[in-house]
């Protein structure tokens, strides 16, 4: 399909569980990823549609203006952010619509050309940020907005879940 792997995502057991992929445009720099496929473990993460991302202009000010505008609209639920991803380095802000789908607004991400080789990254790196709040347990899961608070109260954050997975992988090794 003309994609290059930017990051091969490794699970706690060391096996690949997904990838961040970019379009191959030769020596022309392109966004760190256009497509991200991750197989999350367990029954709580069935792996359907995760989220759509929308680039705002090159301005952090525009991202923040959008954040505060979204807070004034009673139709959206804030999911995660504002922060900066480790992988791809973009600043992000995630919101849910009334149907429970997640939408990312982002800016200022890495640009890579075809000469940049594939990198190996841990699943922990996917959900961690250079700065920003911890990743909620509901991230990457499509569910009705009225269920989000209940799920978050019952389940750990994604970093907590990953820690449990890493401990289980060490015990099984």
Model-derived segments and spans:
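Core segments of cupin and vicinal oxygen chelate
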Residues: 1-28
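A short beta-turn/loop motif at secondary-structure boundaries
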Residues: 11-13, 44, 84-88
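Short, solvent-exposed aromatic-acidic interface loops
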Residues: 40-42, 109-110
